[in-house]
């Protein structure tokens, strides 16, 4: 069903009543949908670099408007090819009893703009000027005005946009996350041994996740990994910290008011296999769901197919120390510093065997996608259960070589084989090994049968409030033009309906 109403008063008033019907003991995988890798968005573009749908660098469900949003990142060029950054509004059929999803449809594509100029995925140039360079990775809708708040990896940045995608303001960034080579801002430098970056966020490891408190007063931006200074350099080689940072921002002022330490999974002393966080989702004013993943799974080179690890954990900021002025380097935190508390057991395992073997996931051939990056809690189900939606970033199913030549990446779910071919033409294909390395150019010839572009993936999970210790949605307290209905109507939803709001544009 496409739930027809989004009701602030209803959501707030009947949440306790609805939650009484939730009886399952743990989150349950319901089903998945796979979306063809060649699908276009509604921007009007028809090529890979201006119109191919960029999948879910983040997801957000707006309960005030009953709308789903998906974020595209900096584009297929990895920061080397011009791409107008954008946001997608989409629909899903949601079975009100089971939470099963179907019929993914794009309804609206919004470009991010600063006046007449679009924010672009090209890397900053010159390297000390951020300009309109933008690599969107985290998304929320502000409950008090409906604006979009988007986090970025280049800066890192936190920008507010209005409903048309027009830039409103930039939040102030603390000094310790700004990338510097010595005293000079440098948005493209890398740490040792190859580069000169000495402090701030690592490149391509900026604000990967973003969450909003239920009342909209605070936004929480999370670095994919810790800062350069949180790591260590030994023998000229940089090693990341086992800790990363959650930054708390006051949305009224745009200023950071605290930072918290979050420990990644693993024995250390440094995270392995590219481990970092991909998403953060608020459960209430103190508790969050954080998605961690490694760099293994079905993806473009250099993704290794072996041993993907993608899990979401419940965390609590209550009692955590503000580490705004504390280094997170070393095997342990300084005496007296308390990190966020983290449930030792994952709430969900996105690549559990039972998930990958489900018939709805046949397009993956029993193998897990590399980049799970989006999490959102959707509409309540008819018994009061919560629906959790998870989504992947397929990198547009595009890769490129050192000279900037792009290739489409194709996947065979039966064999698990991958090949890369001429862009938008399945010719001159080259093999990709299980470990992600690329063979001799053209060693496969034209695209063999059984291959298709890497799909985007959405999965639905059903869970009770008890599974997550309760949930408070970001519901607006500002009156608006949305239709009202009673709690009885919510309990009576049992047919597939299309949301009239979701059909329209904002």
Regions found by a protein language model. Name each.
Residues 1-10:
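Bacterial N-terminal signal peptides that target proteins for export
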Residues 9-19:
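Bacterial N-terminal signal peptides
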Residues 13, 24-25:
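Long, low-complexity, Gly/Thr
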Residues 19-20, 152:
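Intrinsically disordered and other compositionally biased segments
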Residues 25-475:
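Sequence/structural signature of beta-propeller domains
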Residues 476-496:
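A short, hydrophobic C-terminal helix/tail in secreted or cell-surface proteins
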Residues 493-506:
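C-terminal membrane-anchoring or membrane-association module
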């Amino acid at each position: 069903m496409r739930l027809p109403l989004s009701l602030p008063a209803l959501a707030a008033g009947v949440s306790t009543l609805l939650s009484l019907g939730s009886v399952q003991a743990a989150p349950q995988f319901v089903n998945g949908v796979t979306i063809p890798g060649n699908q276009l968005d509604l921007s009007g573009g028809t090529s890979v670099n201006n119109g191919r749908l960029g999948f879910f660098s983040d997801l957000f469900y707006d309960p005030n408007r009953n709308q789903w949003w998906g974020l595209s990142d900096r584009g297929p060029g990895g920061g080397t090819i011009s791409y107008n950054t954008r946001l997608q509004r989409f629909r899903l059929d949601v079975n009100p009893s089971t939470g099963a999803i179907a019929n993914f449809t794009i309804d609206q594509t919004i470009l991010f703009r600063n006046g007449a100029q679009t924010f672009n995925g090209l890397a900053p140039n010159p390297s000390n000027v951020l300009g309109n360079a933008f690599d969107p990775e985290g998304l929320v809708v502000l409950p008090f005005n409906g604006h979009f708040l988007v986090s970025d990896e280049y800066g890192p940045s936190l920008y507010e946009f209005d409903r048309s995608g027009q830039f409103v303001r930039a939040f102030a960034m603390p000094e310790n996350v700004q990338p510097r080579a010595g005293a000079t801002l440098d948005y493209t430098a890398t740490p040792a041994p190859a580069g000169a970056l000495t402090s701030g966020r690592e490149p391509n490891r900026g604000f990967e996740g973003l969450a909003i408190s239920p009342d909209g007063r605070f936004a929480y931006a999370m670095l994919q990994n810790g800062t350069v200074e949180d790591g260590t350099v030994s023998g000229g080689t940089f090693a990341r910290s086992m800790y990363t940072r959650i930054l708390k921002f006051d949305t009224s002022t745009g200023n950071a008011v605290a930072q918290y330490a979050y420990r990644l999974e693993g024995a250390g002393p440094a995270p392995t296999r590219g481990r970092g966080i991909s998403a953060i989702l608020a459960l209430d004013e103190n508790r969050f769901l954080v998605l961690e993943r490694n760099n293994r799974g079905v993806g473009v080179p250099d993704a290794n197919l072996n041993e993907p690890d993608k899990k979401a954990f419940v965390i609590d900021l209550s009692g955590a120390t503000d580490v705004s002025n504390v280094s997170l380097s070393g095997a342990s935190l300084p005496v007296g510093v308390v990190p966020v508390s983290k449930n030792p057991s994952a709430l969900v395992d996105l690549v559990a065997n039972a998930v990958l073997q489900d018939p709805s996931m046949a397009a993956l051939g029993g193998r897990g996608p590399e980049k799970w990056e989006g999490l959102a809690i959707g509409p309540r189900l008819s018994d009061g259960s919560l629906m959790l939606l998870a989504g992947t970033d397929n990198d547009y199913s595009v890769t490129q070589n050192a000279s900037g030549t792009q290739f489409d990446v194709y996947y065979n779910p039966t064999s698990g084989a991958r090949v890369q071919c001429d862009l938008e033409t399945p010719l001159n294909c080259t093999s990709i090994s299980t470990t992600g390395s690329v063979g001799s150019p053209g060693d496969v010839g034209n695209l063999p049968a059984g291959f298709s572009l890497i799909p985007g993936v959405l999965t639905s999970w059903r869970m009770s409030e008890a599974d997550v210790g309760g949930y408070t949605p970001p519901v607006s307290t500002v009156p608006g033009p949305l239709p009202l209905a009673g709690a009885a109507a919510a309990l009576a939803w049992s047919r597939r309906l299309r949301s009239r709001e979701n059909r329209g544009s904002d």
